Amino acid sequence: MVRWKRRKAAFLLSIILLGGCGGNDLADQPWVAYHQQLANDLSVGNIEQAEPENIGAFPERKARLIEVPETRDSILNVYALRECQITSLVAARNNQLGRVAPPSQQWLYERKLWQRLNSCWNSNIPEQLSDENRDRLEHLTATKTAQLPAVSWNAIFDSSEWEQSFSRASQPLTQADLMDVPQHLEAIDYLQQMTEHQFDPEWQQDSSTLESHLKTLQERPLTAEVLRMLLLANQRLREANNLLRQQSDEPSHCLRQWDAASLERLAEAANQWLMAINRLIDTQPVEKPSAVQRYQTRWLSLHNPQAPWAQFQQAKSQHESLRAHFDTC
């Protein structure tokens, strides 16, 4: 019985391991075929391929969040501001379900609270309050106004959907995956709108729309897939470049056309995605945690020469230049 269980466990583990390799093999197939084409054209052996590096670990939760002090006040003090229509909102936030609400719902609560406080402060209600309650309203409104950008940042960076997008347990993006990218871009665009309009009293957020977009982001770790696609392409291009460089002194062979259309489509999707991610991060009116700044510069940047995008562009440009030394078959 014990032996059977061990065999079953080993069998299941083998399935998991094989399953984990499948996506990478799929992304690598066009490169294997292209390397073989180059080797045949140049009458050499197979190009030796190495495993590309994985992306770096996403910053730990504590390192990527901004501390927001909890606002505490008595029920009586909140009730004194009942004309601002915040009592039921605060009560819902303080009940058991409200305290364990996901970051997205906390974001909606804080923004709605700010809207009501801001509207109240800019109405004739403060004139009807006692001096003490008017000061209390002014202080609470100022506090929530100052905290809202950090709350918005935390709502995104504390969400499991956002963290999942950067998962190292992922595979490179493939041609077949491109159909999912537009829907993910729509999700990022909605988060962008929420961020840009967080201080717009007229703009109304929608809970179901927000949750729907977050669900989309959770369906696949697209940021990680994009980065790993770039790392794979960079690795394979540099391997091909090494071969072409060795043969370029006496280019006695011709090269067949390189069908790079699928790579161009993947690169365009990667550029669109990284632009959207960087724009969302940079739009936040906060001082970004240093761990997030480092991760963004190292992995997400479109300008850092050491980041995956620039490395891929450099390798691709070198490859096109090296191919130009050879006649086309």
Q: Residue ranges of each PLM-predicted region?
A:
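Bacterial N-terminal signal peptides that target proteins for export
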Residues: 2-11
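Extended amphipathic alpha-helical interaction segments
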Residues: 139-285
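N-terminal Sec/ER secretory leader and immediately downstream segment
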Residues: 25-175
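C-terminal motif of bacterial Sec signal peptides marking the signal peptidase cleavage site
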Residues: 17-20
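N-terminal non-cleavable signal-anchor helices
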Residues: 3, 45-48, 310
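Eukaryotic low-complexity, intrinsically disordered regulatory segments enriched in serine, proline
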Residues: 22, 26, 52-60, 208, ...
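Hydrophilic extracytoplasmic domains
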Residues: 275-329
